[in-house]
Each structure stands twice: as C-alpha cells, then as structure tokens.
Amino acid sequence: MKEDLRTIRISDLTLPELRGMSTAEPPGMRQQPMLILPNSFTFSYKAENFTACQHDILILIFEKLQGFMTTGCPLDKELCSEQKVTIDCSEIMDIRHKEHVIQAALGLRDLQFGFRYIRDELGNVNRVWGVFVTTVEDIRDTSFIRLTINRDIFPVLTYYGESVGGTFLLKGPALETKGRHTKTIRNMLISRKGIGQFQVELDEFKRMLGLSPQYRPSCLRKDILEPVRRWLLENSDIWFEYELIREKVPGRRARSNAIFIWIYSRDKDGKKKPS
C-alpha cells in the first residue's frame, strides 16, 4: 500500500444529520441530476485499471451514496454499519450478461484503499487500510446484485469538502461512454473542466491509463489518444485536443516527456467552445 494517503477530518456528525443534507450542484446545472465523485476517491486509485464494466458499477454505487455526500464534515465511521448497495445490472448491459457484471463486481473485492484521518483537535493522525467491496450477492431471478461496502471507506466516499474536490457527472453519459480508457479520460476532462487545460508528465499520464512506463508515445497516440479523442468529439458533450511535449536531450533524439491537453465542450445549442 502506498504511503501517499489522503488526510481528511472525522467529526461527530451523526447519520440522521448527514441524510438530511442536500446534494450540491455546480452553477447552471440545476435542471439535471448530478452524481458527485469525491476526488479523494477518484484520484487515489488506478481507476484506469478498472474494466469498463467496473467503471459503471462504481457509478451506480455512487448514485446510491448521494444522500450521504457532504461538503462539511465527513461521516463518523463509527456511526455507520456496513452499507449494502443494490444495483441493477440491466443499467450496465443486457440481463443475459448479468454474470459478466457479477464477475466485474467480484474483481472490486481486490480494490484496496488507504487514507489518513485527523482524529482530534491536537492534529493526531490515524492511518486506515482496507478493501472496498467485501461481499457480492446475486439476487437470483432478477437483474439485481447487492454489494457490501466496507464502512471504513465511507469518509473517502462521502466527503468532498475542504482540500478535497468533487467531480460532477451525469449518470446517463457516464454509463453510455464506451471503453475503459474513454471513461477514464472523460473523467479527467470533467474534473479539470474549470481550468480548461492541463499538462501532465507522460509517465504519470500512462500510469493514470494503466499503461507501463515503456509504452511507446507513438502507440499511445495511435491506439488510445486518437480513438478516444474522436469518440468523445462525435459522441460526448466534452472532448479534447492534445500535444505531446518533446524534450531535447543533448546528443540524443528528442523524446516526448509530457502531454498538454485542451478541454472543449458544447454549449446548450451544440456549439463548440473552450471550457
């Protein structure tokens, strides 16, 4: 388990108080139901290693947790018993492929999480490690499965307040996006839409996409960046343009060491505009 754990503050906020809180939405988006994915979760994992089906399972899990979301103090993990979440597999794929969804859900039992929390006013910090999904239950003769979520991860799943932002997603487009790399890159774009552009080291970008450091930039462009860019341009309300930044090394060929991405979206009339 990596030591670069997130640090959040645990308070004595009770479960009834948390259930009564409303889910915040970004300005201008009041007419559409939003899902909030706290960045403490989405940026703490190699989400790019999830299959497309596992991406969709996580979307449906977060939909069930929206009533617990807070920009204030996180839920006291001692007050919440293990949380069971029921999801409809037919929202992900045809019911004939329910077994495929079950296998993807079983894979989430291997998803490890870790974070630090400040336990008192003196700033003393505890560290927590664990698994995300503990059990998967097949509700036979239906399209539903029931997942048990480890209660100790609730602070990470429900808090998007100070120092921890949140990525706002529309459920429909998130589920309709095809392919794990497309889903991962689309989430990157949405989480950074407010700044309109960003640059990241190429090795880090490869890690975010679940690729080895040896993955060639030419293959990255041909097999991932271009297909994803075209799919988003044709099918999504948000897409990107990019440039691979080449570093000149004396006595050697210039090599790509970073990627710069410009984020674009469509306004309500479908016109292209920079984000």
Positions of PLM-derived features:
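Charged, alpha-helix-forming regions
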Residues: 2-275
